[in-house]
Swiss-Prot record:
The keyword Phosphoprotein does not apply. The active site is at E80, D108. The probable endonuclease active site in the N-terminus and the basic amino acid cluster in the C-terminus are important for the shutoff activity. The C-terminus acts as a nuclear localization signal. The C-terminus is recruited to host protein complexes involved in nuclear Pol II RNA processing. InterPro entries: PA/PA-X, PA/PA-X_sf. Keywords: Decay of host mRNAs by virus, Eukaryotic host gene expression shutoff by virus, Host cytoplasm, Host gene expression shutoff by virus, Host mRNA suppression by virus, Host nucleus, Host-virus interaction. The record marks K195, K198, K199 as: Important for efficient shutoff activity and nuclear localization. It holds the Pfam family Flu_PA. The keyword Zinc-finger does not apply. It is found in: Host cytoplasm; Host nucleus. Its main location: host cell. The record marks L28, L65, K202, K203, K206 as: Important for efficient shutoff activity. This is Protein PA-X.
Length: 252
């Protein structure tokens, strides 16, 4: 799984995920599924924001990289991808500027067009189940929730999907590609099922002839790994570094 992640995701995303796991003492060589999940969530957040701007009339527009209008204001403020201190600083600034209610938990994005925070979810399970879990945790009508699955399904608060159909299709296609590439490498079942992940981990450890004292237990504790990424101020140039992430994963 680790090799797959390094091949499939943009190096910047991989580096951010590595730092996140290291900060919380999580070994990416053991918790490879979490490593893949963090990278996937980061990429979806970036793809959600990329190419979306607000013009001088306050209208939301989609702009490609080579368009001179790329200096326009980004429609979305990316909160995910920053360390906690920086992230809360951004949230507080947004609240002070827009009058938005401060969320209890760090959201992933802020939508300047619809003036609301957004929580992005990527699930390997049923979208409605994950949506309800998110809603029960957040317990706020002021944070918009948008859930994507690896099967092309999605669910959003009040069926308001925020983005245009083409932008959402791009995200769904990327997630489906990740699933297919995992399946081609025999990784998908273990990514979905903790029991299968444990079996795969033991198999990998045995094949690599690692030391006998290395833990083989798959940890399933909940952490804030997604919230402690390094500061990464997003500007109009960020899409250049991320564009490679949108390409299909290289075949084995």
């Amino acid at each position: 799984m680790e090799d797959f992640v390094r091949q499939c995701f943009n190096p910047m995303i991989v580096e951010l995920a590595e730092k996140a796991m290291k900060e919380y003492g999580e070994d990416l060589k053991i918790e490879t599924n979490k490593f893949a999940a963090i990278c996937t969530h980061l990429e979806v957040c970036f793809m959600y924001s990329d190419f979306h701007f607000i013009n001088e009339q306050g209208e939301s527009i989609v702009v490609e990289l080579d368009d001179p209008n790329a200096l326009l204001k980004h429609r979305f403020e990316i909160i995910e991808g920053r360390d906690r201190t920086m992230a809360w600083t951004v949230v507080n600034s947004i609240c002070n500027t827009t009058g938005a209610e401060k969320p209890k938990f760090l959201p992933d994005l802020y939508d300047y067009k619809k003036n609301r925070f957004i929580e992005i979810g990527v699930t390997r399970r049923e979208v409605h189940i994950y949506y309800l879990e998110k809603a029960n945790k957040i317990k706020s009508e002021n944070t918009h929730i948008h859930i994507f699955s690896f099967t092309g399904e999605e669910m959003a608060t009040k069926a308001d999907y925020t983005l245009d159909e083409e932008s959402r299709a791009r995200i769904k296609t990327r997630l489906f590609t990740i699933r297919q590439e995992m399946a081609n490498r025999g990784l998908w079942d273990s990514f979905v099922s903790p029991k299968e992940a444990k079996k795969q981990l033991k198999k990998d450890l045995k094949s690599q002839e690692l030391c006998a004292g290395l833990p083989t237990k798959v940890f399933r504790r909940t952490s804030s790994a997604l919230r402690i990424l390094e500061p990464m101020w997003m500007d109009s140039n960020r899409t250049v570094a991320l564009r490679a992430s949108f390409l299909k994963c290289p075949k084995k």
